[in-house]
Amino acid sequence: MNRTIKFRGKSIYDEEWLYGSLIKIEKDRYAVIPSLNDIEIGKSIGMYEVCLETIGQFTGLYNRNGEEIYEGDIISVNGKYPKIVKYIDEYACFCLANISDLNKKWMYPWQQVSPGWWIDHKQEIRVVANIYDHPELIKEE
């Protein structure tokens, strides 16, 4: 299996982004350790607690520059249409929502995206920011 499963989260100590495997410490407390593939046998590893609200999973997808796309990222397509990436349990997949649709009461903003869409638009997708470092980008106007 070639699927990379990893997470990111902000350190509770210095707000640095940490990447790797997610470990549950106890109820509502999580830590990130280096990806299991990067751990050498016989070496000690660091475990760093992360803020629960900032944890996001790697989607397995990359943008046009080869940058990893994570849950919580804000992406744009051709410099337009800012969208948020989020895993939706009901659909059992990563979905997108137009930021402009998030506060509309009359619609459910999250849309499934076919695998072909990611392939067709890969050269047009750019990670603009994420909702944790730039919450102002998703505020209602």
Predicted regions and their residues:
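Secondary-structure transition motif
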Residues: 1-141
